[in-house]
Amino acid sequence: MKRYFTQNAVFAGLFRMVETLFGIEIEEKRTSVWHPDVKYFEVKREGKLIAAFYADLYAREGKRSGAWMDGERTRRRLPDGKLVTPVAYLVTNFAAPVEGREATMTHDEVTTLFHEFGHTLHHILTAQEEAQVSGINGVEWDAVELPSQFLENFAWEHDVVKAISRHADTGESLPDELFKKLIAAKNFEAGAFCVRQVEFALFDMLLHAEFNPKTDSVPALLDAVRKEVAVVFPPKWNRFPQSFAHIFAGGYAAGYYSYKWAEVLSADCFSAFEEEGVLNPKTGRRFLTEILERGSSRDAIENFVAFRGRKPELDALLRLSGIVDAPQASKKD
């Protein structure tokens, strides 16, 4: 399947998609960079420069592993009235082209790219002029992943996958048969994974909200949580809490729930595009105006309600995960 996702086709399709949705133009420009592989892009709206970003895509010796986005410059209004243009870094560790052959990507790498580009857009498409609330600055911990996971959903959408795939040898897009297998693999044991995440989140929250270290037992607390939500129970000798680095060493103390909550928000936002057209510019502009441009100038839940017209619901996440079926259209006599 990797041969179907050539890097040039994926990037071209991704850029076309966000240009359509958010009314922007992305153009590569030459400038000084820290490595020959790094690319620099300007983002314009109606010909006017509004942002820029660097893309450092390939793995190399001495480079930190993983994928991430970071802000290099935040949009803000200076005391002299000058408006600072936002700039971001988009960093991954994909395999570089070899011997002149076009680089290809796994679909997992495609979703990683979409995810980090969602973060990038969140920072550079802001309309705020105060640095503290501009871009990704000040966004609540349980909503900062909304734009990234939102954009990920497009990487699983049939028409988008068709548009970004181009076989390295034949030039054909991903066949429907392989697309169905791709979705089936994504949804395999999705219910078990969801329940496991709920278990982690509930244990974390109870540990930080109600646990008394003088009288309570950590294993007993986890056992109580598992009795409430678990489907598969680990052996008695399991010592999961001792290795739960996310909440003890990774910054997610009393916040592990944010992983699943961001999925709820992002899936619900994406469902608006399913209802109104996946590449509907009108829906895209509304998402831009009510969420991306807002930064942290108002509460994230207010941003969501302004876009969706209601409070978050679970249905979209359960459906996109394959846990429940899509509702059938009612038949008319």
Question: Model features per residue range: what roles?
Answer:
Residues 1-333:
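Cation-handling catalytic/transport regions enriched in His/Asp/Glu
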